[in-house]
Amino acid sequence: MADKSFDIVMVGGGSNSLVTAMYLTKFGGLDVGIFEARHELGGGWCTEEPVGGFMANCCSTAMCDWYWEPIKRDIPEWEEYGARVAQSRVGNVVLFSEDQSCLTIYQSNFDPTQELTAREIARFSKKDADTWLWLWDKYKNVWSKYVKEWWWNPAQPFDKQDGLDKLLADPASGADPLWLRMSPMQLYKDLFESIEMRIAFQRPNQSYGINTSEGGGGFHALMNTVFASPNWSYVIGGTHQLAHAAQRVIIENGGKVFTKHPVKNVIIENGKAKGIRLEDGTEIEARKAIITEVNPSQLVHNMIGKEHLSEKIVRRVDNLESWFINITWYTWCLKERPHYLAEKFNPDCGEGATCLIMADREDEDYMVKDNIERQLGRRPSKLNLTTVAHGWHKDDLLAPEGIDFNILTEQFFLPDYLLTDKEWKEFEKTHAEEVIELWQKYAPNMTWDNVIGFNPITPHYTANFAKNFGPAGNWGVIDMCASQMGRCRPIPELASHRTPIKNLYGNGAAWHPMPGAHGMQGYNCYKILSEDLNLKKPWKEKGAPW
């Protein structure tokens, strides 16, 4: 006999589990129990305080204005409880080392037509400025509706059109089918004539989880370029506020949360998931369904057991790639903001800029080299650094009053398993020194005298933060290569959230459509459950397209 019983049992309380649980409790009216191994909920919605008053996001930090769009539509109190975001004036800025000039992409809230951005691009190429305005027009008037249909619906079978298929089939989209086959670097060379624009989005693509040199990622990279670069936002008070707000919605609607309750496995009887067994031996009954937010390997080998699955599913999961999206995020607590030499070229590249990329014109294929080195298991021979700055206003609650901002530096590195614990500890310090050395070349005031403290997040930290990010310490759980996107993510047999075990569902960043803190998987998982369990569908009641 089970020790406890719920309608729905959730294994893991990460961001997507919280989204699904909000819907299950509010619209499904179901009794939900969430069992989380860590001391708190949220997964990648996490924030720490390394120095008094400074908030450091340890995973998801830069969001976009289209994140959580249907969730806020259906559950408006979530925003009221703390899921609030803000934007700065500038999105991406590329700093060029040769002459300390810069290419500036303004945010859509400040530059809704992108004419100001086009003016900046025209300083390097009038033709590329026109191309940017063409892309922006396509994004606003054609692409957006199709891409959102792809994002906010479960993975479709291969014999049924999804949103991306419809986009490519619409002559008004202007999309070239060849872009689907190209690498991002090939696509940028196809679209832009200037070195500056070809370089501008290579490094941000890496931040999205897309390999610049890999075939099949071109159109996905282009979508992220246009959808994200002018649309960055950040969570007021730190990303973990999203988890606090979601937990409040869940508890108000009858859900229950159990932290420090690691799950050992799913209990399976006659091909059906009946409950879970905790590591301490406690058994929890699931009357209707079990939803896991573990990685695909954990789902197959730990939660289910490969004896319950086909050899094909086990083999495909074992062959998933996770070497690429392994990252360092160092949040820097500073006395004053960096003063960039490029502010003489455009003053807006300093205060108010979100993402700054440090680049060299002479090295157009710099990201290709970085990717090859890391794929061979070698440390990158050169820093390809970007900074992510948030705040600038005391109401953003991200730093002590009078400072009012925080800045994170990001560098991709090797997977956790390639270095020892001792090597990672040494790397934490040496990487900080390398960052300051490079940063000074663009902002001379960025010396150690300006540093109060820093929070070093490495792939080693991420792999040990929560098991589903392991063994690589991959922020996307698995990579976003062409064979692991959309209806193929993580594998076609699991992409719809349903598993071969009745009443058992997979969820999380490793599922369709792409990794991130946007909650798409959690929303789409509820859509599948609403079909299987005959639950309310608030999007239909509101007449929404998705």
Residue map of PLM features:
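N-terminal glycine-rich phosphate/pyrophosphate-binding loop and immediately adjacent elements
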Residues: 3-148
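Rossmann-like flavin
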Residues: 98-214
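Flavin-binding catalytic cores
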Residues: 125, 337-338, 376, 425-460
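A glycine-rich dinucleotide-binding beta-alpha-beta segment and adjacent secondary-structure elements
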Residues: 194-209, 382-388, 445-512
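Helical element adjacent to the flavin cofactor pocket in flavoenzyme catalytic cores
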Residues: 223-273, 277
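Mid-domain catalytic core of redox enzymes
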Residues: 264-398
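Active-site-proximal substrate-binding core of FAD-dependent oxidoreductases
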Residues: 268, 532-546
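A conserved FAD-binding loop/helix module that cradles the flavin
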Residues: 509-530
